Amino acid sequence: MSRDDFYASPFGVTYSAYAERPWLNRLIALTVWGGDTRRYYESMSAIREVADGGTIVDCPCGAGVALRELDPGENLRYVAVDLSPSMLRRARKRIDRRGLSRVELIRADATGIPLPDGSTDLFLSYWGLHCFPDPAAALVEAARILKPGGRLVGSTFVRGRDSLRQRLIRPDVGDFGKPGTAEDIPRWLEAAGFSEPQIRRSGPMLFFDAQLA
């Protein structure tokens, strides 16, 4: 199975189902990874801080979990990007259920998003960096399409030897691409042009919030 079809597997179906249920996702994360996902859902409030008429890019959008913060008729451009056709289909169903008319779905790689330079106010990058073959390049692409002072909010798994759970995060195994370490993420962010990123960690999960300088 190719990587872009990985989420068509039973794992992808299960992952999409529990990601939409914060209580269940938190229980699974605590049990399997020893981390707390509350910050993931809390950080989605950044969507409501974007000014009227602003643009949000959600890459990878997955099944569209972050759409929970959008209201029908809201005057925002929301661009949901993913490489997985199955995830985009699930996101479409979520869009239709919620009656969201201003969400655009795009199938694209995280290092080649078809939007102009400096066109985006908020970039969401949830649970994607550890899946990408070049996560540092994905952050450079996020910086490219963000406006000066634009905001990046996201989460990722980080590899390391701090715990047995972290040792399970191995490059090119399952849906992992080239996951970075806890030290790599702030370094990659700063190299891409983000200033003073706020980093929080829970087990092997790392949450980041940064502005483009």
PLM regions with names:
Residues M1-A51, V65, E69, I169:
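Conserved class I S-adenosyl-L-methionine
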Residues S9, N25-A29, V153-D209:
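C-terminal alpha-helical "lid/dimerization" subdomain adjacent to the S-adenosyl-L-methionine
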Residues T55, G150-R151:
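Short glycine-centered segments of the SAM/dcSAM-binding site in methyltransferase folds
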Residues T55-G112:
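Class I SAM-dependent methyltransferase SAM/SAH-binding core
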Residues S86, P133-A136:
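Short N-terminal helix/helix-N-cap motif within the alpha/beta-hydrolase-1
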Residues T111-L122:
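A short acidic, Gly/Pro-enriched loop at the edge of an enzyme's catalytic core
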Residues L122-D134:
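A short SAM/SAH-binding and catalytic strip from SAM-dependent methyltransferases
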Residues A136-P148:
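A short glycine-rich, Lys/Arg-flanked "PGG" loop and its adjoining helix->strand segment in the class I
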